[in-house]
Amino acid sequence: MPNPSCTSSPGPLPEEIRNLLADVETFVADTLKGENLSKKAKEKRESLIKKIKDVKSVYLQEFQDKGDAEDGDEYDDPFAGPADTISLASERYDKDDDGPSDGNQFPPIAAQDLPFVIKAGYLEKRRKDHSFLGFEWQKRWCALSKTVFYYYGSDKDKQQKGEFAIDGYDVRMNNTLRKDGKKDCCFEICAPDKRIYQFTAASPKDAEEWVQQLKFILQDLGSDVIPEDDEERGELYDDVDHPAAVSSPQRSQPIDDEIYEELPEEEEDTASVKMDEQGKGSRDSVHHTSGDKSTDYANFYQGLWDCTGALSDELSFKRGDVIYILSKEYNRYGWWVGEMKGAIGLVPKAYLMEMYDI
């Protein structure tokens, strides 16, 4: 190996070697960072990191020149300054150039301790300053917790590499970020006068799921009601949300009035009880008006967060549990009637999200 103390580059470094070096360092310094390694594996990891730094010290000038050529105006570098030492470059790499761009500060939190995680998974995040080592994308474990987007080196990290509040942002697919086979897996989160966050998912479907989840929360932040509620889908659930309208036609039929008017006084109470039973039966029938469960995808929901029922008629469920909605007759109170694993009870609609995008 060339002498690490050498300050000049012995020759141009092939692009294939640059890419290989970038991938190896990402894996060794970042991916393995959150893994539970044996003592021998940790020593080997540290040795590889040192060797990579030695190689970079030899080709430092070339990396710097390459970075200047690739640096564009699309991103601002908050860590601008002299990069004449490996320690400074390493520090920038370790921090993932992920300082908050809008001045917001969030306390450190372990990935496993995030509350109310709506969606999480591994994504490739585009570096804000991707000149260092000449590569752009880094694998990150990302999580949408309430209205804050966190990203970590892995799902075992004790502290996030960065985060930002999504309020005020917009999200969209963008197939112009890459030219390889993953171009249809890219999306970006952007806002005027704010930093652009760009990601690559494992598949186009996964990218679309991230976009839909983010849009759901952003739409909720911009309104006083939960998106996809009754105003948007009222025609589908009119017969469910207004049970009185279901039973009222039975009471208004002339033949019913004639029958009960002719009953003797002592039998009116019995007739009234029968009417109440009929009304109750009509309301109960609402639970089964949605159709065949095997194809009724619109009424399948999943838990956004853990929920423990306070009363015996309330269902308890965990985040991700599948719940089939039988009725929305208590929608005005924020409750629906759901079924999970054979149990039926009330569920708070704010704790649910649609399972299928129809």
Swiss-Prot record:
One of its GO terms (biological process) is B cell activation. PANTHER family: SRC KINASE-ASSOCIATED PHOSPHOPROTEIN 2 (PTHR15129:SF2), SRC-ASSOCIATED ADAPTOR PROTEIN (PTHR15129). Residues 255-270 have a biased composition (Acidic residues). GO terms for cellular component: cytoplasm; cytosol; nucleoplasm; plasma membrane. Expressed in kidney, lung, liver, spleen, bone marrow and testis. Present in T-cells, B-cells, and all cells of the myelomonocytic lineage. Present in all brain regions, with highest levels in neurons from the Purkinje cell layer, hippocampal gyrus, cortex and substantia nigra (at protein level). Induction: By IL-6 in myeloid cells. Belongs to the SKAP family. The SH3 domain interacts with FYB1 and PTK2B. It comes from the Eukaryota. Signal peptide: none annotated. Residues 14-64 are annotated as: Homodimerization. Residues 116-219 form the PH domain. Residues 274-292 have a biased composition (Basic and acidic residues). May be involved in B-cell and macrophage adhesion processes. In B-cells, may act by coupling the B-cell receptor (BCR) to integrin activation. May play a role in src signaling pathway. This is Src kinase-associated phosphoprotein 2. The gene is Skap2. It is found in: Cytoplasm. Residues 296-357 form the SH3 domain. Keywords: B-cell activation, Cytoplasm, Phosphoprotein, SH3 domain. The keyword Phosphoprotein applies. Residues 232-292 are annotated as: Disordered. InterPro entries: PH-like_dom_sf, PH_domain, SH3-like_dom_sf, SH3_domain, SKAP_fam. Interacts with LAT, GRB2, PTK2B and PRAM1. Homodimer. Interacts with FYB1, which is required for SKAP2 protein stability. Interacts with PTPNS1. Part of a complex consisting of SKAP2, FYB1 and PTPNS1. Part of a complex consisting of SKAP2, FYB1 and PIRB. May interact with actin. May interact with FYN, HCK and LYN. Interacts with FASLG. SMART domains: PH, SH3. The modification Phosphotyrosine is found at residues 75, 151, 197, 260.
